[in-house]
């Protein structure tokens, strides 16, 4: 029998598109393939993966073992592969990933020259993402050996990134009950045996983030095993293991915490009923109760607000009122949470209006705060107005208790103040706050960032906001140089174009839009109205250039192709932007880079709406997230709901009861009723793929056809009895799929009696239809017309 240095075990399931790339990355390893044993375990794959396995088995019969078994999940496949492994070291690799050329060479060198049994490698995403793993801090400082009993914040739970000495795995097996996080449990058992691991930065494990989200991890939250089996059989097991190995307790608790924290605030519950949701919440809370506060507080690269929320969830109470000061630190249960001299005040709105400097800010690390914020200027302390609101953050315990973020507002006469510092008062002592400029603030955290308005120039330095009258051109040049040093190429380029074209471009542009790829909503009707009644207005309609409506709208007026350079320049020079939609790229087309351009973008934003708001959507469209300047409503009830729900943070100066511009179109034209039934269900957030960056489109969800939603509606429109009745009475159904689900359109069965569309002319549909059927979409309100 050949003595291999490494046995690579690869479970194979439904990966014919990726498998060859994985195999080749191993064959091409610099240590030579003759030193590698590859074990391909076909876990009942339904595609043509077997042909690829057999092809390479035939090419390398001495190196490759091919095993075929019934589907049992990745754990059973890895266990089966271990039975055949003869190499000195084991590598469990996923069948859609790849490794860098010297991956094994570098790993073997560290393993054989050091007294360790495990090394792990840096992770970089590829395919649908290009970033490093969110815990990349572990790989700062180069290659090293870490003693996990002393430095526990190096969680190792992504199995394919590890190279392990085989003798360490003698009696270990993967838990076949686990479909998700099986490697967390397995790797925890491994590290308590070795206690030291090698960290390798210079070679990479390339983790595929699939475009279609079809990998097990990407689709995990649509699987009940994710909610129940993983907490019960993986998390709880590891925390019990911590009791048996006291010197590894902090490591094991931290490893579980790194998985659990994302579940608390980034989890969808679309597949859970109310009882299941309650059970899941208690499972996660029970996990947190077994993790020491000290470990929660000590997390690396985690915002203080997340730590605060984890503790609140753990103890199921508002801990804001329970905090105590001890030696200039805020403490909970005698555990120091943060140093009061390091508190950060986040300024999310800063602008000038009517010669007043208006500042809105939040202290997002102390929820349910009883503390006041002061502005210090000219030797005096001015108290800010305080209000408590939900911050719009998704979390799994919204129904358990109010979870409120303190917001502060102040308006200052620019003639009276020149320098501003912010302080928090706690137990009769004031602490100076560090400032961070976010979201809609007209100045940002860059050195030389400035905001010029009405002859005033606002700058900041060393946590002091200054108001003066420096020459803006000189400051802007210094600011651009700062952007260059920070390698912020996109905002630098746009700012350069903005300044170059400034003398030649009008600065009173109005930009109107609906969806990025379709017209036909309130934006179009407002655009037409203005073109007819105010021909001097410098107005544009924004639309994707390949839209079916582009040529039609071009005949009405000037069109701005969305995402073109000209669109960005016009947007920066716009006086007003109005849209029936409020997706990020519409009211904030510069995305995360907008903070660098806010000082130059002076536009007001009007939200026209594309329907009637019947639910509380403050977490999505409230001031903290969208900061609109005018919010159009259709009815008194809707208007009152926006005004009276404090979490929107909009008052009567912003919310206006005018009706939607598209409403008038319902009474125009001579369209007659037809024998048409409009079937118009709303969408489900848990059943759609991720948004495609910079669009309103979503990726295809390969699990969609397994949902009750699909099976019900597809069963309805393909029901033979219904189709016979439609034929008998000469009726047709127009199935209007919500635009957010248009990627799934081809999943539904079509017939001569059922037409399926995702973005019809809604006004025409309402006028033509004899009957409209919906579930709980606000479109039902049209029935009252």
Tell me the role of every PLM-derived stretch.
Residues 206-211, 218-246, 268-293:
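Catalytic core of nucleotide-sugar-dependent glycosyltransferases
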Residues 246-247, 253, 519-531, 661-747:
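Conserved catalytic-core segment of nucleotide-activated headgroup transferases in glycan assembly
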Residues 60, 743-759:
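Nucleotide-activated donor-binding/catalytic signature segment of Leloir-type glycosyltransferases, i.e.
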Residues 1-5, 30, 246-247, 251, ...:
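Non-catalytic N-terminal targeting/anchoring module and adjacent flexible stem/linker
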Residues 651-652, 746-751, 778-785:
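Catalytic binding pocket for nucleotide-activated donors in carbohydrate/polymer assembly enzymes
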Residues 1-233, 237, 677, 782:
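Nucleotide-sugar donor-binding/catalytic module of glycosyltransferases
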Residues 359, 392, 499-501, 507-666:
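Active-site and donor-binding regions of nucleotide-sugar-utilizing enzymes
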Residues 607, 758-785:
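A donor-sugar binding/catalytic signature common to diverse glycosyltransferases
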């Amino acid at each position: 029998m050949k003595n291999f240095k490494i046995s690579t075990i690869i479970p194979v399931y439904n990966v014919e598109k990726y498998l060859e790339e994985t195999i080749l990355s191993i064959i091409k390893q610099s240590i030579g393939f003759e030193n590698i044993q590859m074990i391909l375990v076909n876990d009942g794959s339904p595609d043509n993966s077997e042909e690829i396995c057999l092809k390479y088995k035939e090419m390398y019969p001495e190196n490759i073992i091919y095993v075929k078994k019934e589907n049992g999940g990745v754990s059973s496949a890895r266990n089966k592969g271990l039975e055949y492994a003869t190499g000195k070291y084991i590598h469990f690799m996923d069948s859609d990933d790849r490794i860098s050329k010297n991956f094994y060479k570098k790993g073997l060198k560290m393993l054989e020259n050091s007294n360790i049994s495990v090394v792990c490698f840096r992770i970089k995403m590829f395919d649908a993402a290009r970033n490093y793993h969110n815990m990349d801090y572990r790989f700062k400082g180069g290659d090293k050996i870490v003693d996990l009993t002393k430095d526990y914040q190096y969680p190792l739970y992504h199995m394919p990134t590890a190279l392990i000495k085989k003798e360490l795995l003698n009696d270990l097996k993967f838990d076949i009950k686990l479909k998700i996080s099986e490697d967390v449990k397995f790797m925890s058992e491994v590290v308590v045996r070795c206690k030291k691991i090698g960290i390798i930065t210079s070679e990479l494990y390339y983790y595929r983030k699939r475009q279609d989200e079809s990998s097990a991890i990407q689709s995990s939250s649509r699987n009940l095993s994710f909610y129940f089996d993983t907490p019960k059989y993986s998390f709880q097991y590891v925390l019990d293991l911590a009791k048996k190995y006291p010197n590894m307790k902090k490591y094991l608790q931290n490893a579980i915490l790194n998985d659990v924290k994302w579940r608390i605030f980034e989890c969808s519950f679309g597949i859970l009923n109310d009882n299941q949701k309650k059970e899941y919440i208690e499972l996660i809370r029970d996990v947190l109760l077994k993790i020491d506060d000290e470990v929660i507080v000590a997390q690396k690269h985690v915002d203080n607000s997340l730590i605060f929320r984890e503790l609140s969830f753990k103890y199921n109470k508002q801990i804001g009122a329970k905090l105590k000061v001890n030696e200039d630190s805020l403490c909970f249960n005698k555990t120091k949470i943060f140093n009061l001299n390091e508190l950060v005040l986040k300024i999310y709105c800063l602008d000038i209006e009517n010669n007043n400097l208006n500042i809105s800010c939040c202290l997002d690390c102390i929820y349910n705060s009883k503390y006041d914020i002061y502005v210090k200027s000219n030797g005096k302390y001015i108290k800010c107005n305080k209000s408590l609101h939900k911050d719009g953050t998704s979390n799994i315990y919204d129904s358990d208790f109010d979870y409120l973020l303190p917001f502060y507002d102040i308006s200052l006469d620019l003639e009276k103040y020149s320098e501003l510092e912010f302080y928090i008062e706690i137990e009769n002592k004031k602490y100076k706050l560090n400032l961070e400029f976010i979201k809609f603030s007209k100045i940002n955290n860059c050195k030389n960032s400035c905001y010029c308005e009405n002859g005033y120039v606002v700058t900041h330095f060393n946590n002091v906001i200054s108001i003066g009258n420096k020459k803006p051109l000189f400051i802007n040049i210094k600011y651009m140089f700062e952007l260059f040093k920070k390698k912020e190429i996109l905002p630098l380029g746009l700012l350069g174009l903005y300044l170059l074209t400034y003398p030649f471009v009008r600065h009173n542009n109005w930009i109107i839009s609906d969806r990025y790829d379709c017209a036909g909503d309130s934006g179009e009707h407002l655009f037409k109205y203005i073109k007819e009644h105010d021909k001097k207005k410098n107005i544009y309609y924004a639309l994707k250039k390949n839209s079916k409506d582009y040529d039609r709208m071009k005949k009405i007026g000037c069109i701005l192709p969305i995402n073109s350079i000209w669109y960005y320049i016009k947007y920066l020079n716009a006086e007003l932007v109005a849209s029936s939609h409020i997706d990020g790229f519409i009211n904030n087309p510069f995305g995360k880079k907008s903070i660098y351009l806010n000082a130059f973008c002076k536009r007001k934003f009007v939200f026209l709406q594309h329907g009637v708001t019947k639910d509380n959507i403050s977490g999505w469209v409230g001031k903290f997230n969208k900061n609109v300047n005018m919010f159009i409503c259709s009815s008194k009830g809707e208007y009152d709901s926006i005004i009276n729900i404090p979490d929107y943070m909009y008052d009567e100066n912003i919310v206006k009861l005018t009706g939607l511009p598209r409403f008038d179109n319902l009474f125009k034209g001579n369209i007659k009723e037809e024998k048409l039934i409009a079937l118009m269900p709303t969408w489900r957030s848990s059943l759609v793929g991720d948004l495609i960056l910079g669009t309103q489109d979503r990726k295809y969800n390969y699990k969609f056809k397994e949902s009750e939603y699909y099976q019900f509606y597809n069963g309805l429109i393909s029901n033979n009895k219904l189709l016979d009745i439609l034929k008998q009475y000469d009726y047709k159904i127009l199935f209007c799929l919500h635009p957010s689900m248009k990627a799934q359109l081809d999943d539904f069965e079509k017939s001569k009696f059922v037409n399926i569309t995702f973005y019809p002319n809604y006004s025409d549909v309402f006028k033509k239809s004899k009957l409209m059927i919906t579930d709980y979409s606000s479109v039902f309100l049209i029935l009252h017309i």
